[in-house]
Design a protein with these regions (language model features):
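Second-shell loop/turn segments in exported
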Residues: 56-62, 79-85, 110-111, 141, ...
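Bacterial Sec-dependent N-terminal signal peptides
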Residues: 1-25
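Metal-dependent phosphoester-hydrolase catalytic domains
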Residues: 196-207, 215-322
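Active-site environment of divalent metal-dependent phosphoester hydrolases
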Residues: 90-92, 116-118, 173-175, 214-220, ...
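Active-site beta-strand/loop signature of hydrolases that rely on acidic residues for catalysis
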Residues: 32-34, 71-94, 124, 165, ...
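N-terminal, active-site-proximal structural segment of metallo-dependent hydrolase catalytic domains
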Residues: 18-105, 113-119, 189, 285-293, ...
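Metal-dependent phosphoester/phosphodiester hydrolase catalytic core
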Residues: 158-189, 193
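Structured beta-strand-rich core segments of catalytic domains in phosphoester-bond hydrolases
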Residues: 82, 88-164, 168-171
Length: 322
């Protein structure tokens, strides 16, 4: 009897060890559109006047500090090891955020893009969790000289596995969804070209896209990514009541997405934990009353400071080594 008990304990401990080992230190990957994180200085090369001292919004140093404080609060709640950000003006605000406000010491990757509003994509990452191999901006050239943000590409290594990360902020729907869809189609084609090149060298490459796609998972341009084995993790959430990362004219939308290549679901190397997909939808991040109840609690409403966080909610998922 004593031998059987010892055997059972041994088996239980082994099962616990291997179960924990499978899930030890997952890589938490997130994304958030921070909504206009600008510094206070007027850059003559950018359309940032309204966010500068003396500009239309009457921004002060206290308002700037509040924006950074609230941005850091969301990042702390998200607690991602790697997080893509959109709508960040420049390197100055990134350094200010991570050096003086964040409770976690991130490093960052950023390139100035030609976007006419002066907003860029950024990747924050924990050097203790992922090694960066290479990074570069991918120019997103739209017809008619329309200036938009680059796609940020980063190649990293996690637990001896290569992972390809794309941080995206697809062209806006301003002017109408249908009218602006061709711009997003060009960006989708750019993504297809870049990823096809990666897959031509490694058919099992582990690829993840993080971004505000200004289109839902069942949108025509997101659907086009399926031709190269990409799939939005947000797809199962479509149509669920009160579920979304953004609200447009009272309708919840899933424009902020994590999109993966099928290789991250093949049970080899790195895999996505589907149960870990999470929208950071805490009560404090939504307006609780009034005409815009349930809308994300944004920082700006036109030229008025609401003092919230962003008009988008953050998202995250866990990646584990199989």
């Amino acid at each position: 009897m004593k031998k059987n008990i010892h055997t059972m304990i041994c088996i239980t401990l082994c099962q616990f060890y291997f179960s924990c080992n499978l899930n030890v230190e997952p890589l938490i990957v997130g994304y958030w559109n921070v909504e206009n994180l600008f510094d206070l200085i007027d850059d003559p090369e950018k359309n940032d006047d309204e966010f500068s001292i003396g500009g239309r919004k009457n921004v002060t140093e206290d308002i700037y500090k509040l924006k950074l404080t609230h941005t850091a609060e969301v990042l702390a709640d998200l607690n991602a090891d790697v997080v893509g950000l959109s709508e960040v003006e420049n390197e100055f605000v990134i350094k200010d955020l991570i050096d003086n406000y964040s409770n976690r010491k991130y490093d960052y990757i950023h390139y100035d893009s030609p976007d006419e509003r002066g907003i860029d994509n950024v990747l924050l990452y924990d050097q203790n969790k992922i090694d960066i191999i290479s990074d570069r901006p991918i120019s997103n050239n739209l017809p008619g000289g329309d200036k938009t943000r680059d796609v940020l590409y980063v190649q990293g290594k996690y637990r001896d596995e290569i992972i390809h990360i794309f941080v995206c902020h697809w062209p806006s729907r301003y002017g109408g969804v249908e009218k602006t869809a061709p711009k997003r189609a060009i960006t989708a084609q750019l993504i297809v070209k870049e990823i096809s090149s990666i897959l031509s060298e490694d058919a099992d490459a582990e690829i993840i896209l993080l971004g505000d796609f200004n289109e839902e998972p069942n949108g025509i341009n997101i659907e086009s990514l399926k031709t190269i084995g990409l799939k939005s993790l947000m797809e199962p959430m479509i149509g669920k009541p009160k579920v979304g990362t953004y609200v447009y004219r009272g309708k919840d939308e899933l424009v902020d997405q994590i999109i993966i290549h099928e290789s991250l679901q093949d049970q080899n190397g790195l895999i996505i934990d589907p149960e870990s997909l999470y929208i950071l939808d805490l009560p404090k991040y939504r307006q609780q009353e009034g005409r815009y109840a349930h809308y994300p609690f944004r920082f700006w409403a036109g030229d008025q400071v609401l003092g919230g966080y962003s008009d988008h909610l953050a998202i995250r998922v866990a990646i584990i080594k199989k």
